[in-house]
Amino acid sequence: MVLCPVIGKLLHKRVVLASASPRRQEILSNAGLRFEVVPSKFKEKLDKASFATPYGYAMETAKQKALEVANRLYQKDLRAPDVVIGADTIVTVGGLILEKPVDKQDAYRMLSRLSGREHSVFTGVAIVHCSSKDHQLDTRVSEFYEETKVKFSELSEELLWEYVHSGEPMDKAGGYGIQALGGMLVESVHGDFLNVVGFPLNHFCKQLVKLYYPPRPEDLRRSVKHDSIPAADTFEDLSDVEGGGSEPTQRDAGSRDEKAEAGEAGQATAEAECHRTRETLPPFPTRLLELIEGFMLSKGLLTACKLKVFDLLKDEAPQKAADIASKVDASACGMERLLDICAAMGLLEKTEQGYSNTETANVYLASDGEYSLHGFIMHNNDLTWNLFTYLEFAIREGTNQHHRALGKKAEDLFQDAYYQSPETRLRFMRAMHGMTKLTACQVATAFNLSRFSSACDVGGCTGALARELAREYPRMQVTVFDLPDIIELAAHFQPPGPQAVQIHFAAGDFFRDPLPSAELYVLCRILHDWPDDKVHKLLSRVAESCKPGAGLLLVETLLDEEKRVAQRALMQSLNMLVQTEGKERSLGEYQCLLELHGFHQVQVVHLGGVLDAILATKVAP
């Protein structure tokens, strides 16, 4: 609560965070700050050797990030933001500055250097106040840094590589995230924990106090320490306009003492009321409102993809809203609002010339991009969205809602719900293809699979994962096993290339037909579709096909054991309720299932994105 008055000074200002870091965004959002996110395009190529101290480098980088955003926004629409916040976090050990690793080998080198040693985490922060005068941008910069000492335990090579393969180190200074899996590497922390996460909130609030609440004479007489955040009542006494009303010139009857006592009593009552209000006033529910209204943003994105807005803008000059509207048979006013919210979400760029795609939109949202998620988005728009409108029924009944969404009972879930027509089958395959391509490299490299000369991707759909396995392991022959209706169309998703000779397609039902022979069986996002009895049936069939020493690679989204914190996995488990007969499971649940069917030596790698990989070995009975 003491932070609210400080943050409140920025409440009605246009505040911009010049950082794409989700951790910084979360820290500031949780503190009640309202802000836009405009990632800086400043190239972080400052000469580190030219700075006398590491924190000097961090502060200068933070300042340049903020100034770049301030200038870009002003040039864009000649309207300066009120405040731009820039930040840069670095890790230093032995005089060496460590930033974000460039690849997995670099991440391993960084973490090896930190093993068993104490290092410093510096975050430089720049607060840039902007104004315009005579059509010129004027900026005032306030900057500071925070240092936190962190000590790592002695770490084994195996543990370091397991963490590197999780993918978590790749976007973090020093190659670790203390707030997530990286916390297991840390032995002790001395200083501000949030500084290590990415933003020193406490010091930031102190800096706001210095900027917006300079010390008053009476504070100085009382030797108030302004390197700390003042108590809440200090803020209430301050205002943007000093002064107050004059005293009455005529005095009422009564003794001076009586009036003094009455005045003191009234003041005490007012102060008590003021304190009671401050103590009972809850923090502004920013995060809650985002959850309540978040579906609007999601539907905006889904609709833009449905109208193929990002296809129209790919590799094209900026276009006006009216021009785009005419191409998709939409109203100009409606299209302008849709494009504006897409720009606010960072999916489009908006200039005086019109709207254009961001790099994110070109890569992921245009339907012909190499890593396009357009098919996945259409699956969510055309099917998942409708199913979730019946979530209340799913919770009450404990069953999927295809019968309500489709108007008929699905006797065979996949045949009736996903493959009922060539169009719905192709939509489902495009959805699976997009998501699999996005994660296939992480899955294929999660473990060293070079000992296996053959693999069978059970339910492998378009063969996207099979192709990545073939690319990573040139000696491996990979068979994609799926239903005949899927195999019939799968070849359309396979681009030409040297991996084609390693990949084979076989049609069949994995619950009924013999599985192709292989040394490694892969079940990628298969088991979560099914209830326990069918999971046992499928694992039993895989186990029967395995010789001792054969491997089973499971790829799923793991729940945490207490089902409290793995938000994406918990969300997907709810998704499985409305869509399928299955559910998400924890590592402990999968380990029990695997051991029951003769698979042991269970290893797990958290892939850092949306999936987790489990590798187990079939042992002799």
Swiss-Prot record:
The record marks R23, T89, Q179 as: Important for substrate specificity. It catalyses: dTTP + H2O = dTMP + diphosphate + H(+); UTP + H2O = UMP + diphosphate + H(+); CTP + H2O = CMP + diphosphate + H(+); psi-UTP + H2O = psi-UMP + diphosphate + H(+). Residues 249-262 have a biased composition (Basic and acidic residues). Pyrophosphatase activity requires a divalent metal cation. The modification Phosphothreonine is found at T234. Changing R23A: Decrease in pyrophosphatase activity. Its EC number is 3.6.1.9, 2.1.1.-. S-adenosyl-L-methionine binds at D482, G508, D509, F510, R525. The gene coding for this protein is located in the pseudoautosomal region 1 (PAR1) of X and Y chromosomes. It represents a unique fusion product of 2 different genes of different evolutionary origin and function. The N-terminus is homologous to the bacterial maf/orfE genes and the C-terminus is homologous to ASMT. Exon duplication, exon shuffling and gene fusion seem to be common characteristics of the PAR1 region. Nucleoside triphosphate pyrophosphatase that hydrolyzes dTTP and UTP. Can also hydrolyze CTP and the modified nucleotides pseudo-UTP, 5-methyl-UTP (m(5)UTP) and 5-methyl-CTP (m(5)CTP). Has weak activity with dCTP, 8-oxo-GTP and N(4)-methyl-dCTP. May have a dual role in cell division arrest and in preventing the incorporation of modified nucleotides into cellular nucleic acids. In addition, the presence of the putative catalytic domain of S-adenosyl-L-methionine binding in the C-terminal region argues for a methyltransferase activity. This is Probable bifunctional dTTP/UTP pyrophosphatase/methyltransferase protein. The lineage of its organism: Eukaryota, Metazoa, Chordata, Craniata, Vertebrata.
